[in-house]
């Protein structure tokens, strides 16, 4: 079972049952120097959004007739390795609801076959192409559906990339909330157009891999984030993705403001379900469930994979324990009904009740036959892999994304594009393949050959791999290859020869350590791996023309060689997936002009970043990760600190040039009030009888054949559990069953719909002024006035558009819309979004990077070219 070692590695980070982590204790930490997450109860019911009304009506009819066992079955996983998927719920055969399959990953079906390994999220972000973001989502959804996956665990919009060394930044779309928001929301729309359910992750503050999970000696770290920073930065892409209709949200491992995400009532009940109007279901990250009653009351709807503190022992915080909690009254039956209704309504909303496939693969083995429940001591066997090919023509989309993401940082003397008759010398193992096999390392937990993706659960097996070496050899008959990370002796260099040096930087999830890096880039830092810097310098000493190709998970330091005279060009190819070679040669040899742009800043030194975004650790006690930099991460920090980076956010050159002319700013809807119009009232939600179910509903069925370690909803003594209903149970601090007033910032999925009123529109004419075809990206940044009374970043990306391929001399007019929310700050006192009245003092900039602004507009004064 290929995935088994990976999950065994998780055991070192498990949450033990004896670990003291009660919500009540967390919520009483009120010292002014300590972060605090206030209580927010009860959990809001779903079903009040009109777009979900039909699905909730169907769910209500079914749930009204379910037994307690059937309800609990859908909220709890059946246990790790107790089915074909990363996790699966129980089923309700009486109503045609199967075991729901939840499975990775954000870039392709994990641990499967005949699937596409798409470029990673960071690569998609670098395209700045909304159409490709959506198309990739469609491809992911089609492949998930084809494999029988009900819930695909992605996209990831958290981490956002606060910490440049963070291990999983590459799963998201870039170090900016708007870029993440467009990437996440468009991916969700694409995925769910196919009927697959997207599970948006990780809510929230999982910005570092090390110490995120609790262990026998310490709790996972607490991400301590102030309310304004939470809303304007980290929550922003989640809000946009909820607005896109996300069916599921995955909760992170860590704490937020000293309250574990899986039972953080403010985060789940207050912000996600009430303020953002989330209508789907909330699921744990795998083994992130640390308590039973407290998590249910805090708004958690599904536990995955269902196991308790130590997997493989057949224990659970829910399953039969949830049945017990409902019978004894510690979990109100109303809460269970809402949990189940949310799950079933999402199933109906995506049309999964109509001819949706069952799982036809196994993530546990590549064999055709095997145990149906691999985690059981004794398991029946059968066909587990049907080898269904779901790739379709998705390789075309994968290649287009990988190609359009390639970012040209430098091109002195126009050394690129190459001519097919150039004499080339290629260096670096990153140009080649993994000699052990392209899928030989579990979850890509090694760095051998071309880097196509990071490592961890967010990966996919490669159906094939076109390496740069193969692709270049296919085009050039004058290429010599030195697939080594040590510069070979005896290499000769003619005056016109061109050296292409391949280097990379890797990272991933913390259950695998690669070359001393436990997920985060702890040992390597932001330097190239495998002697990369020295390899470039050695080539630069020998050759007059050096092209550097970088495959990387994020920012990488280049100072040792970037200014060398012979280093003429640098391409960042990000994480290209299976089409690594063809996408690169499309650009290298000029079939296409590069049109990618950096989705993060590349610094001169790691010391350019604020100290607070470094990796944090301590030997004992819970780590307090204080977000003292506030809104100022990545380019926002560089601008505030007046630090010129090596390459700014949004930077990307082309083989041609573009002019931005004829800018025009139009008022679409007046900002005549500081705060948005009053939110619409909540609609009605499903109602159910409030009487406790009969204990017999969770009694073991007669002659039932139990599977060892399978997690069931049944109790050995249900009558005994019901008899305890007269007892008084302790509840989390602040718990109440009285509904709270509807938050004024809410009113629809994502928040008050007035926030998305388009207030201004900028039009700009983009002209190809060069001699080659190419595409330009217009990036719109806003600067908010000091009249708001708050410190705000001097530039904030809020919109972007990409031209079609423009021939030399051809133009296209782009329209970039700006919403009320785009111009708002979060008022922590009023608890609403505040904008400058009439947009007074707002400045809008449009350009090709945050440092290359071509157009400036001032509301009320108009626009000019810069």
From Swiss-Prot:
**Which region is the signal sequence?**
1-20
Glycosylated residues are 65, 73, 257, 328, 360, 395, 421, 474, 659, 664, 724
From which lineage does this chain's organism come?
A: Eukaryota, Fungi, Dikarya, Ascomycota, Pezizomycotina
Reactions catalysed, semicolon-separated, are:
Hydrolysis of terminal, non-reducing beta-D-glucosyl residues with release of beta-D-glucose
Which residue ranges does the record annotate as region Disordered? 725-748
Signal as UniProt keyword = yes
Q: What cellular component GO annotations does this protein have?
A: extracellular region
Described function: Beta-glucosidases are one of a number of cellulolytic enzymes involved in the degradation of cellulosic biomass. Catalyzes the last step releasing glucose from the inhibitory cellobiose.
Instruction: Show the InterPro entries listed in the entry.
Output: Cellulose_deg_GH3 (IPR050288), Fn3-like (IPR026891), Glyco_hydro_3_AS (IPR019800), Glyco_hydro_3_C (IPR002772), Glyco_hydro_3_C_sf (IPR036881), Glyco_hydro_3_N (IPR001764), Glyco_hydro_3_N_sf (IPR036962), Glycoside_hydrolase_SF (IPR017853)
Entry protein name: Probable beta-glucosidase F
Q: Where is the active site?
A: 285
Question: What pathway or pathways are given for this protein in its record?
Answer: Glycan metabolism; cellulose degradation
List GO molecular-function terms, semicolon-separated.
beta-glucosidase activity
Query: Does the keyword Secreted belong to this entry?
Result: yes
Organism for this UniProt entry: Aspergillus flavus (strain ATCC 200026 / FGSC A1120 / IAM 13836 / NRRL 3357 / JCM 12722 / SRRC 167)
Q: Quick one: a GO biological-process term for this protein? A: cellulose catabolic process
> Where does the record place it?
Secreted
Q: What class of enzyme is it?
A: hydrolase
- Its EC number is 3.2.1.21
Family according to the record: Belongs to the glycosyl hydrolase 3 family.
The protein's UniProt keywords, in alphabetical order, are: Carbohydrate metabolism, Cellulose degradation, Glycoprotein, Glycosidase, Hydrolase, Polysaccharide degradation, Secreted, Signal
């Amino acid at each position: 079972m290929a995935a088994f070692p990976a999950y065994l590695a998780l055991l070192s980070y498990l949450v033990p049952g004896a670990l003291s982590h009660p919500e009540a204790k967390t919520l009483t930490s009120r010292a002014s120097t300590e972060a605090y997450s206030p209580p927010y109860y009860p959990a809001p019911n779903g079903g009040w959004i009109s777009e979900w009304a039909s699905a909730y009506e169907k769910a209500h009819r079914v749930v009204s007739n379910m037994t307690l066992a059937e309800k609990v079955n859908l909220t709890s996983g059946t246990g790790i390795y107790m089915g074909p998927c990363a996790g699966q719920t129980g089923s309700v055969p009486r109503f045609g609801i199967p075991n729901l399959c939840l499975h990775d990953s954000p870039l392709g079906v994990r641990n499967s076959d005949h699937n596409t390994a798409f470029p990673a999220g960071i690569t998609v972000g670098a395209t700045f192409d909304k159409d490709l973001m959506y198309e990739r989502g469609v491809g992911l959804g089609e492949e998930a559906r084809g494999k029988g996956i009900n819930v695909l665990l992605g996209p990831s919009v958290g981490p956002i990339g606060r910490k440049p060394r963070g291990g999983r930044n590459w799963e998201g779309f870039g170090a900016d909330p708007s870029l993440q928001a467009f990437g996440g929301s468009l991916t969700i729309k694409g995925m769910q157009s196919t009927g697959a359910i997207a599970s948006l992750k990780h809510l929230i503050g999982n910005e570092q891999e090390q110490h995120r999970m609790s262990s026998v000696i310490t709790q996972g770290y607490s991400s301590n984030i102030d309310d304004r920073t939470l809303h304007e930065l980290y929550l922003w892409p989640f809000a946009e993705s909820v607005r896109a209709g996300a069916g599921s949200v995955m909760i992170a491992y860590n704490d937020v403001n000293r309250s574990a995400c899986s039972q953080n009532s403010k985060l789940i009940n207050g912000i996600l379900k009430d303020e953002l109007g989330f209508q789907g279901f909330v699921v744990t990250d795998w083994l992130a469930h640390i308590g039973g009653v407290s998590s249910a009351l805090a708004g958690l709807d599904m536990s995955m994979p269902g196991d308790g503190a130590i997997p493989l022992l057949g224990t659970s915080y829910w399953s039969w324990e949830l049945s017990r909690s409902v019978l004894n009254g510690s979990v109100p039956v109303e809460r269970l009904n809402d949990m189940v209704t949310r799950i079933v309504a999402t199933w109906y909303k995506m049309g999964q009740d109509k001819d949706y496939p069952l799982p036809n693969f196994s993530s546990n083995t590549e064999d055709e036959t095997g145990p149906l429940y691999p985690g059981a001591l004794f398991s029946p066997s059968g066909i587990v892999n049907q080898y269904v090919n779901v790739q379709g023509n998705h390789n075309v989309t994968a290649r287009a994304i990988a190609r359009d993401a390639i970012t040209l940082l430098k091109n002195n003397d126009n050394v690129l594009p190459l001519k097919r008759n150039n004499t080339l010398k290629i260096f670096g193992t990153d140009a080649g393949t993994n000699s052990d096999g392209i899928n030989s390392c579990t979850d890509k937990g090694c760095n051998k050959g071309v880097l196509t993706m990071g490592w961890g659960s967010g990966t996919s097996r490669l159906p094939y791999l076109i390496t740069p070496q193969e692709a270049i050899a296919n085009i050039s008959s004058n290429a010599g290859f030195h697939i080594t990370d040590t510069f070979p002796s005896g290499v000769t260099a003619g005056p016109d020869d061109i050296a292409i040096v391949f280097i990379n930087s890797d990272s991933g999830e913390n259950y695998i350590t690669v070359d001393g890096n436990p997920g985060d880039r702890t040992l390597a830092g932001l330097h190239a791996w495998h002697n990369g810097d020295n390899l470039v310098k050695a080539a630069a000493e020998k050759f007059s023309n050096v092209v550097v190709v970088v495959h990387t998970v994020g920012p990488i330091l280049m100072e040792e060689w970037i200014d060398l005279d012979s280093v003429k060009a640098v391409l960042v190819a990000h994480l290209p997936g299976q089409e690594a070679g063809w996408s690169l040669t499309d650009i290298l040899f000029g079939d296409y002009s590069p049109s990618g742009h950096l989705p993060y800043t590349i610094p001169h030194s790691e010391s350019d970043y604020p100290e607070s975004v470094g990796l944090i650790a301590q030997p004992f006690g819970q780590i307090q990760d204080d977000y003292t930099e506030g809104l100022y991460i990545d380019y926002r920090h560089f601008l505030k600190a007046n630090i010129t980076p090596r390459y700014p956010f949004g930077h990307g050159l082309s083989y041609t040039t573009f002019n931005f002319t004829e800018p025009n700013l139009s008022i679409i809807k007046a900002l005549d009030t500081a705060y948005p119009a009053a939110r619409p009232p909540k609609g009605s939600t499903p109602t159910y009888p409030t009487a406790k179910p009969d204990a017999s509903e969770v009694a073991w069925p007669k002659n039932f054949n139990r599977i060892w370690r399978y997690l069931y909803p049944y109790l050995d003594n249900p009558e005994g559990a019901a008899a305890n209903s007269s007892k008084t149970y302790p509840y989390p601090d602040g718990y109440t069953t009285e509904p709270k007033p509807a938050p004024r910032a809410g009113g629809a999925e994502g928040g008050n719909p007035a926030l998305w009123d388009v207030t201004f529109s900028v039009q700009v004419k983009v002209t190809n002024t060069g001699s080659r075809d190419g595409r330009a990206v217009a990036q719109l940044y806003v600067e908010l006035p000091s009249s708001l009374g708050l410190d705000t970043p001097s530039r904030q990306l809020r919109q972007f558009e990409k031209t079609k391929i423009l021939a030399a001399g051809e133009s296209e007019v782009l329209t970039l819309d700006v919403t009320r929310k785009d111009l708002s700050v979060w008022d922590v006192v009023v608890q609403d979004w505040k904008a400058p009245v009439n947009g007074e003092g707002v400045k809008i900039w449009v350009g090709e990077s945050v440092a290359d602004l071509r157009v400036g507009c001032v509301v009320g004064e108009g626009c000019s070219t810069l």
